[in-house]
Amino acid sequence: MSGMTEVSSLTGRLLVATPALADPNFERAVVLLLDHDEEGSLGVVLNRPTPVDVGDILEDWADLAGEPGVVFQGGPVSLDSALGVAVVPGGASGERAPLGWRRVHGAIGLVDLEAPPELLAPAVGALRIFAGYAGWGPGQLEDELTEGAWYVVESEPGDVSSPFPERLWREVLRRQRGDLAMVATYPDDPSLN
């Protein structure tokens, strides 16, 4: 697990649930942290697709949504709200950000879903729509990290748009070095092992 030298250093990173994390909202979850500071943390779960098509709730954005084209459950907070997260190729460089997109980390950013989709269409490489988000109050995430509930790892732009979100937990762990890569082989139900 990575150490934290400053509170803001986790924005843009992934929280990967450890096998010991028992909360059903976060079992084998991969959470992209969109904001992390002394006031708390906010992120979205990248590997919880729902059966709801993006076009059913945000018709104008459906054409930009990456496969599988469904809304993802971003977390247990504010399930009636939608968040858009998009990868803008070249967005990590110093280029001017497209209108309607705010950089979070590298090429990953938040989309203003009130903006006309055609403003972003030429720039967006991948878009995911999330219903709800994961939120932590001041110090709450740090406590969970101390308790060993999460691994903190670097994100990659492809994590946001993985076409196989059900594999993301294992894929993210496999690309880590050392013992952490072995966690990817942990069985779904250790009692059957």
UniProtKB/Swiss-Prot annotation:
Pfam families in the record: DUF179
Family of this protein: Belongs to the UPF0301 (AlgH) family.
SUPFAM superfamilies: VC0467-like
Coiled-coil ranges per UniProt: none
Record Gene3D superfamilies: VC0467-like
UniProt-recorded name of the protein: UPF0301 protein SCO2948
Paired cysteines (S-S): none
